[in-house]
Amino acid sequence: MKSFVVAPFIVAIDGPAASGKGTLARRIATHYGMPHLDTGLTYRAVAKALLDKGLPLDDEALATDAALSLDLLAMDKAVLSAHAIGEAASKVAVMPAVRRALVEAQRHFANALPSSVLDGRDIGTVVCPDAAIKLFVTASPEVRARRRFDEVLARGDTADFAEILADLKKRDERDMNRTDSPLRPAEDAHLLDTSEMSIEAAFLAAKKLIDHALAQHRG
């Protein structure tokens, strides 16, 4: 009698900053009862570890040490969402050794579970290239900047829309043109433009694709 191992069912969600991929990933994870990992938080956690110790952000060896000792289950999204940490994270994220260490941790998270939802910039292309379903979530820079602007105001902080828009465009440029794991859709990813979509509409579009992939996965 043959025995076989069923591959984990991984939902890979990629996209630029403020595209809505995180909100969608959390909604999907809740609906299907799947563990969720926001891989962007892993880079923020490394940056915060360096900032907390007053260490330089451009030291790849120190940043890699922080990445290797990171506890994925101890990350606090509320704490890591600070703008300064996001800026610092974009600097450590371009370091190849840091990316390798975090990709390995992210991949282990996905492969150790029967099913999971991961969102980030390179899930479908690098972290989980064999994911059962890949979504690339995007929206126009102006729509994404408006979402980020509204988020900041909702927290009771002040924000400048033009500054947020310029920052997003700069981050897009950096993400798409870095030599290691540039931001791009996987060849087999489903493109989901949420520019004119509500959260519910985006979820229903994703759910239809995931339900089909689940049916195929279960044979």
From Swiss-Prot:
It is found in: Cytoplasm. One of its GO terms (cellular component) is cytoplasm. One of its GO terms (biological process) is pyrimidine nucleotide metabolic process. Its main location: cytoplasm. It catalyses: CMP + ATP = CDP + ADP; dCMP + ATP = dCDP + ADP. One of its GO terms (molecular function) is dCMP kinase activity. It holds the Pfam family Cytidylate_kin. Its EC number is 2.7.4.25. The keyword Cytoplasm applies. Keywords: ATP-binding, Cytoplasm, Kinase, Nucleotide-binding, Transferase. Gene3D superfamilies: P-loop containing nucleotide triphosphate hydrolases. The keyword Methyltransferase does not apply. ATP binds at G15, P16, A17, A18, S19, G20, K21, G22, T23. Belongs to the cytidylate kinase family. Type 1 subfamily. This is Cytidylate kinase. It comes from Brucella ovis (strain ATCC 25840 / 63/290 / NCTC 10512). The lineage of its organism: Bacteria, Pseudomonadati, Pseudomonadota, Alphaproteobacteria, Hyphomicrobiales.
